[in-house]
């Protein structure tokens, strides 16, 4: 059995050396493994450091993009070149703990095709956790895949899963849902999540809306052909819930965090617009 660890990297030079050390320790119990760093157009020296590490560790392979294509493209390229029977994905910022890899392997070998991490005790700011909880709830509701953390970077797959997935745009957020549509067995385990130590989060407000449209496309492709009325009814409800959640978030910022409405007027108006569309 061979393990492939696929790690998208975008400007994580401060984390990579320590990540490599932790990976080497965690993977030492496996008879064969490879580490694929997919550099997504980094400009901070990440590529040079990975090349340096590879000089003393022949388990490392580097795939380099010359500009930033996004996480879905990086994962798709990693899946294409991964040679392992099991493929692990994780982020390169040290928030995912490599020590969880043996736990993921054990769960996969219980008969599952994909095991997703669940960051139950998540070490992120509210600007990430609130949208994440909303999208996880709605994705569970509409896809029927009963996991809590669709977008957790730490996952393990059987090779058959990654070779059949079509990942582009922002669809990496919904890989468990895509796998579930193809009748693969999907489950989750609670994993240790760590606060970010180096660099800045790549999370931006735009991801909230990109994720919204990606989920619509997934639902459209899977359900529109079967029942257009049912599909568009779901979309209307989903859109209404998104708008309602945005308004609740703005109210929370106003009455619990003391931030004036004027500071978030664009978000407030967007929430109203989305509710009307729904």
Where would I find each of the regions flagged by the language model?
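Short, well-formed alpha-helical segments that are part of the catalytic scaffolds
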Residues: 12-26
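Donor nucleotide-sugar binding loop of glycosyltransferases
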Residues: 12-15, 42, 71, 97
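Acceptor/aglycone-binding surface of glycosyltransferases and processive sugar-polymer synthases
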Residues: 52, 61-67, 71-81, 86, ...
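Short beta-strand/loop segment that forms part of the nucleotide-sugar
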Residues: 20, 31-42, 63-64
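Hydrophobic helical membrane-anchoring modules
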Residues: 174-278
């Amino acid at each position: 059995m061979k393990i492939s660890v696929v790690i998208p990297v975008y400007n994580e030079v401060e984390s990579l050396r320590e990540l490599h050390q932790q990976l080497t320790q965690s993977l030492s119990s496996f008879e064969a493994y490879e580490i694929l760093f997919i550099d997504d157009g980094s400009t901070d020296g990440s590529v040079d450091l990975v090349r340096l590490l590879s000089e003393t560790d022949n388990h490392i392979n580097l795939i380099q993009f010359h500009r930033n294509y996004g996480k879905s493209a990086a994962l798709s390229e990693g899946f294409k070149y991964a040679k392992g029977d099991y493929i692990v994905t994780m982020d390169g910022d040290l928030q995912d703990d490599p020590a969880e890899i043996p736990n993921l392997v054990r769960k996969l070998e219980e008969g599952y095709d994909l095991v997703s991490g669940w960051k139950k005790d998540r070490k992120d700011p509210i600007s990430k956790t609130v949208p994440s909880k909303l999208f996880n709830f709605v994705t569970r509701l509409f896809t029927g895949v009963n996991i809590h953390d669709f977008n957790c970077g730490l996952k393990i797959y059987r090779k058959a899963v990654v070779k059949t997935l079509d990942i582009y745009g922002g669809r990496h957020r919904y890989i468990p849902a895509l796998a579930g549509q193809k009748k693969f067995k999907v489950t989750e385990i609670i994993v240790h999540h760590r606060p970010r130590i180096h660099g800045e989060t790549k999370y931006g407000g735009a991801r909230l809306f990109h994720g919204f449209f990606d989920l619509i496309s997934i639902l459209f492709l899977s359900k529109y052909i079967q029942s257009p009325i049912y599909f568009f009814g779901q979309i209307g409800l989903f859109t209404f819930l998104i708008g309602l959640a945005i308004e609740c978030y703005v109210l929370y910022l106003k009455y619990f965090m003391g931030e004036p409405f004027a500071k978030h007027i664009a978000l407030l108006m967007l929430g109203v617009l989305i509710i009307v569309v729904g």
